[in-house]
């Protein structure tokens, strides 16, 4: 297996995940800011690795597999951390909705790939907007420097949950014929 810069960036994102968890639980005043910084660095690599892979024509099968896995693991763990911190339905409900959607759509994409129709459930613009809203909301909720950033983070978290449901309905609609076909 050949490693290139986009794949190394994806691996770097995976390596950052345990550091995010450890720093999140440190009993220091700077821990929320540093955990948010780690998350932001990881989130930026999510955009940057794909950009470089396309720009430099360095897409690999391993990278195509690892990138969405790293993204989903990073986001799911950040959601679990934020949910654990707030201990409230208004954070848990959107987090559970978004995690469930990721599982459903991952299964749908795998199934559609088996049918040779993976492109019918390719990432859409609404999925990209959803991911951006998730990343920004999670960064704010990890950082939480003041009540206004927390409120904005929670509001954006709900926006991300709505976009999550919207994009899921789009993907399911695109696959409807195959899902209902005998």
UniProtKB/Swiss-Prot annotation:
Its EC number is 2.7.8.5. Keywords: Cell inner membrane, Cell membrane, Lipid biosynthesis, Lipid metabolism, Membrane, Phospholipid biosynthesis, Phospholipid metabolism, Transferase, Transmembrane, Transmembrane helix. PROSITE patterns: CDP_ALCOHOL_P_TRANSF. This is CDP-diacylglycerol--glycerol-3-phosphate 3-phosphatidyltransferase. It comes from Salmonella choleraesuis (strain SC-B67). Residues 2-12, 82-86, 169-181 are cytoplasmic. Residues 38-60, 108-145 are periplasmic. The gene is pgsA. It is found in: Cell inner membrane. It catalyses: a CDP-1,2-diacyl-sn-glycerol + sn-glycerol 3-phosphate = a 1,2-diacyl-sn-glycero-3-phospho-(1'-sn-glycero-3'-phosphate) + CMP + H(+). Pathway: Phospholipid metabolism; phosphatidylglycerol biosynthesis; phosphatidylglycerol from CDP-diacylglycerol: step 1/2. One of its GO terms (cellular component) is plasma membrane. Signal peptide: none annotated. The chain crosses the membrane at residues 13-37, 61-81, 87-107, 146-168. InterPro entries: CDP-alcohol_PTase-I, CDP-OH_P_trans, CDP-OH_PTrfase_TM_dom, CDP_ALCOHOL_P_TRANSF_CS, PGP_synthase_bac, Phosphatidylglycerol_P_synth.
């Amino acid at each position: 297996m050949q490693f290139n810069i986009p794949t190394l960036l994806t691996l770097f994102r995976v390596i950052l995940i345990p550091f995010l968890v450890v720093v999140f639980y440190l009993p220091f005043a700077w821990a929320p800011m540093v955990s948010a910084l780690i998350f932001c660095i990881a989130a930026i690599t999510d955009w940057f690795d794909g950009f470089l892979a396309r720009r430099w024509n360095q897409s690999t099968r391993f990278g195509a597999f690892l990138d969405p896995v790293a993204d989903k693991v990073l986001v799911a763990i950040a959601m679990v951390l934020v949910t654990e911190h707030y201990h409230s339905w208004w954070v848990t409900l959107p987090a559970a909705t978004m995690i469930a959607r990721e599982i459903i759509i991952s299964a749908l994409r795998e199934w559609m790939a088996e049918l040779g129709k993976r492109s019918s459930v390719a990432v859409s613009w609404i999925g990209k907007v959803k991911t951006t809203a998730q990343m920004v909301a999670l960064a704010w909720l990890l950082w939480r420097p003041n009540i206004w950033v927390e409120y904005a983070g929670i509001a954006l978290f709900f926006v991300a949950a709505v976009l999550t449901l919207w994009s899921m309905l789009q993907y399911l609609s695109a696959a409807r014929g195959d899902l209902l076909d005998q």
